[in-house]
Amino acid sequence: MDTNFKLSNCIGTVYRDGQVAFSKDGYSVISPIGNKLSIFDLRNNTSKTLDIDCNYNIKRLSISPSGYHLLASDERGVVHFVHLLSEFKIYTFRSNKPIGSLQWSPDATRVAICRENDLQIHEFGKSIENKVYNPFSLSRTYKLSSDSLKTIDWSDDANLLVSGGEDRVVRVVGAKDFKNLFIHPLASHKGYIVNCQFMKNSYDMITVCKRGLANVWTCNLRPGELVEGIWKKDEEGSDDIEMLEDGEQKVEKIFFEKTKKYWLSESSGSGKSVDVTAARFHKETNILATAFNNGVIVLHEIPSFALVHNLRVSEMRIQTVAWNLTGDWLAIGCGKGSTAQLVVWEWQSESYVMKQQAHSLRITTAEYSPDGSLMATGAEDGKVKIWNSRSSFCTVTFDEHTSGVTAVKWTQSGRAILSASLDGTVRAHDLKRYRNFRTLVCPEPTQLATLAVDKAGDLVIAGAKEVFNIYIWSFETGHLLDILSGHESAISSIDIHGNHIVSGSWDRTIKMWTIVDSQAETVEVSHEALDVKFSPAGDEIAVLTSDGVITFFEAKEMINLGSIDTKLDTDPARGSRDTITRQSAAKTKTFTRIRFSPDGNLLLAGGESNNFCLYSVPERMILKKWQITANRSLDGVILDFNRRNFTEFGNMQLVDTSDEEDELEPNNKMSIKLPGTKNFDLGERRARPEVNIYEVTYCPTGRRFAICSTEGVSVYSLDTISMFDPFQLDSQTNAEVIKRAVWNNDYSTAIMASLRLNNAQYITECLESTSISQIPLVASSLPLMYAERLLKWMVEGNVMSSTRHVHFYMIWLRAILQHHGMQLKGRADVATLTGIQQIVAHHQQHITKLANQNKFALNWLVKIRQSKKSVKKEEEEEEDVSDESDDEDIEDESAGSDDEDSDDSVEIIE
């Protein structure tokens, strides 16, 4: 029983706040989502999430010129050094102050960090003190301003740095000691410095301020003209050229001349009433991208400031922009919190490469499709979104509900999704035409809180929140068939298996209903029932009560089979607004959701806590416990708040004691939740939403499960591939053995050795080196253990889903299943076979789509050719007709002329 589930992705969250960046190849966007990082591969249409365990929200990013390393800083000034290939955090160091910006040098040997009001330069990979790994060593610090610094940039030769911030002054400093300059200030702006960058292979600069003023500065020195040494201040009346003792002119001091000024806000469409929120200059194409707080982004060519493009991306404020390597794509982060969206725009073709937006309010429910390829989510904003499980991109959004969505369910065929809402309706949406084709309405206005669909797809069951009734509709006709009443309090959960419906209520009872005769068997429980679920086989029922106890009943006779006490596993934290002790607060919090695994041996539980647990059903014991997040920017992560923050006036964390008046951050004051409220704007920068789990769901393959929490939908999977995970490895298995076996055409030995190393590159080479004629022979010679391992590798890896050799791998699959199918049927994990089915369905969908497009294109070409032929034929016929008419006219004319001649001859005779 494998329980090594690891975080693989976050669905429903694409961008929260902070800086976005492109990868070195320019095809992937790295976006911060809270204390994690999501990488969106735009070329392969996939995404993944790096869980680097930051304690606070990530704000600033910088990728090394090699593309292998990433620096990420959080709200508290902690810098995380991440290796992107292994997706592992290597090192962490504290700057002890908030970081406004950080950037690698072009030669990747130094890192510049704007640490509040000073600039630090760290050398990379030179310091190992006391045999302790320390990749960054501080080389120099510049005290530049009394206000915070916001932006920084290196020159292409890595000798100069330019920085600007809230004091409206741009300063140029040297990365080393130069005789030409020390700190050179440039003051010519009306607002905060939003961006300042050097131009390509030059010391010329462009600077942009918040008020929309852009300046182009020309430097008197070129790269290579800086002289190392100690800078000395010139005396009054002296020239800018330093004289050596022998009288030779040697060093020329640096200065900048403002050669161009332009008001960027004139291109925003709203005049000077809008402010610049982000700007980025692409050095290769000399194009400046400027974003405003009204959602408009404009492109100008530098230094002429010719308007290239103007686009309104969103109605929300644009937080960040980033260019890719070639300057073709522009990544744009809009909004904050749960209302944020991420856009990748190709400005030359004026088209969206990617445009994703999460739910605007918290996600309350999620459900996998029967084949596990899609996931449906419902939120309090009344929208239902369908996400692709493999790419984590939203494919369609349904917004017909007028109130919050409480439950979503798939039909067994996976062609329709049903959603229950607080508006009192159940809506069915077709995933082929993307329309709401049926609406089920209650006979009286009430709020629906639960939903269930039978496997045949004939019945739809929903539980009311106010009138304590269960409604049964016919899915085919939409007619109300029956109303089940009997509960005396709110119905918390319902589930269906076969002809039986089980319901749990706050009246401390669970009822087993028979659909045929509408009769119910009532079983009393010790506390309020919060959730109730059938096992996949239908022979067992699990009931979660408010005291944290999961009780198991035999489905037919309702006999108590045992229980699991989860109270100690909940381990809830004390909220910053709680006025009682942590022990007293823990008594009111418990798990609220449970879900069986597809094989029925595991039970997943989560609720009013930062923790969720996996239990063994046969053993009635806990197997593993996870923490949903370590983000201390959220409330409920730390078990108890710091006593030093608790005074006679209460918790000082709830009091805004700062004197910060950041004009770039509107509504910058502390957001305090009103008494009795559960929801508030999660986009508030200083708000601390409380961590809770609203839903847990298992993928039908059994290799993934999803957790709906305050941070979105977190997907945990067994298919996360580590860099080195060998299988039955011995000392004689190495790369040379594999290469030698492939060279000798011993493909079965090579495949078994590569499977023992579990190296994806070697396995792919061995498989693709095998000729098609020998695939059946090699597949039959593989032992059953290695055949099963090969199938598992195909499911877990990305080779099968992204390969171009689809037919080749289908031949491999057919050969393995033909020779080992009977043994695998009783031996292999069901999840492996289900994963193979998903991969085949994935390729079938893409090939069918491509074939249909080609077929339609060919039909169109044939029709065009036929129409051209018919037009040409008609033209030829018209020409023939015209030729015949011309011939007739000629004959008539000739006949007429003959008559005239005969008449003339007669007259002459006469």
From Swiss-Prot:
The keyword Repeat is assigned to this record: yes
Region of interest (Disordered), ranges: 867-910
Keyword ATP-binding: no
WD-type repeats, residues: 12-50, 53-92, 94-134, 144-183, 188-227, 271-310, 313-355, 358-397, 400-439, 443-485, 486-523, 525-563, 586-625, 688-728
Keywords assigned by UniProt, alphabetized: Repeat, WD repeat
GO CC terms: Pwp2p-containing subcomplex of 90S preribosome; small-subunit processome
Residue stretches of biased makeup (Acidic residues): 875-910
Annotated InterPro entries: PWP2, Quino_amine_DH_bsu, SSU_processome_Utp12, WD40/YVTN_repeat-like_dom_sf, WD40_repeat_CS, WD40_repeat_dom_sf, WD40_rpt
Cited Pfam families: Utp12, WD40
GO BP of this protein: maturation of SSU-rRNA from tricistronic rRNA transcript (SSU-rRNA, 5.8S rRNA, LSU-rRNA); ribosomal small subunit assembly
Family recorded in the similarity comment: Belongs to the WD repeat PWP2 family.
Protein name: Periodic tryptophan protein 2 homolog
